[in-house]
Amino acid sequence: MEIGTSSTTNNIGVAPTIPQDIVNNNNHNNNSSNNSSNNNSISSSPTDSSQLMNGEQSTSPPSPPIEEVLEEEPRNLLISLLSELKIGVDLSRVPLPTFILEPRSLLEKFTDNMIHGEILCNLSKLESPMDRMHLITKWYLSAFHYRKKGLQKPYNPILGEIFRTRWEFKETNSNCIMVAEQISHHPPVSCIYLSNRKDGYTMTGTINPRSKFLGNSMAVIVDGSSTLTLLGLQEEYVITFPTAVARGIIFGTLLTEIVGNSTISCKQTNIKVEMDFKAKPMFGGEYNVVCGKIKKGNETTHTFNGKWDKKVEITLSSSSSSSKKKNGSTNDILWDCNDAVKTQMITRQISEQEEFESQRLWQKVSHAIIKKNQKDATFEKNKLEDEQRKRVKDRKENNIEWEPRLFKKVNDQWIYKYQNHTLYDQNEPKEIETDGIIHFEGTLIKKESKQNLVEKCGASENEIIV
């Protein structure tokens, strides 16, 4: 089961959140009238199906819904559940009702980072370290505007769950491949690896999300970080994340805000970005405001401010030693949502996916949620969780220690087992992905036997596809 490049590149747009066959089976219609005003103007180009490899699909995501107010019955159910919880309690072990779930796994949600991945195509060609940091900051901000309004939480991945996908970028005729795996369930830990060596970068991430109940809101705090590596320049950009806060879960309008601090830092260039995602004040103010500064050592060279779902402007600091710029305004556009082109995600069709791949694993839950059949959604979700508990019990009884399939721990850091940080050679074979392993087309890969996977994962043979 491979995901790789095709010989011709197509101009693709918009990463999906719900597989097209799930959408089609449920006649799920996402009208453009449901788009927010800023999303209406974001362009994407149609997918040329002739560029897809056998068994692949590329689909656009549903339009983000408008803000919502829960109906009386589900709200009463949520109030009943939350009334028994203490403020500050960790929600990772609390079975949340399915009507607040987004029909995709957290592993798939990580692909939001590449909705506008074409921004990075020429990153390694920029000569100025400051210009490179500006472009990385622009890309970072581009990931937030596509989000579910209201209360929409992705599925907690089960242990051993994987997600794999790719994107094709027309500008550089490059192929970007991503694999992700849930390497721990309690506490939840997700690992991701992304490779686009032709454009000169890879990215590794270890994410430890935790949720807290805060009364009329709940917060999803994202511990961990991602590291974007520029291969030819040997620069590493360490990225941290803000907090998502869902408000109005008991009374009021349901909405999600991005709040708190995040950073992008490069030790090799001594440049750091400090960002502050602002919560809307109780009276006045606006949603989705971000401000920040870019520092070279201890000197602030630039500041930026705006709305990450619309436009963010960057200004050369008056105190900066490089402010001998041209006379007049020093304001530039750092990020403009209206001018952004989305990039379409390509995955295997669900029928071609492995049993523990996110879209196939959760497909029955997703079907039910899309149809707003909470009874079936709850049944299917509980079934998956019961099966996971049984596997944990079986491993414990048989003294089997579970091992991640695609990632390994080295010096207290999780790294992708098959990472390749060598410089791209234009004469090298195409880089493709097979069963989670990124490799050159035409080269043999060592595949573990079904029995070894059964022993490691604690699953039945019928659940393993090799």
Swiss-Prot record:
Region described as Disordered: 1-67
Molecular function, one GO term: sterol binding
PROSITE patterns in UniProt: OSBP (PS01013)
Entry superkingdom: Eukaryota
Cleaved signal peptide residues: none
Compositional bias annotation for Low complexity: 24-45
A GO CC annotation given for this chain: membrane
Compositionally biased intervals (Polar residues): 1-12, 46-60
Family to which the UniProt record says this protein belongs: Belongs to the OSBP family.
Protein's UniProt name: Oxysterol-binding protein 4
Organism: Dictyostelium discoideum
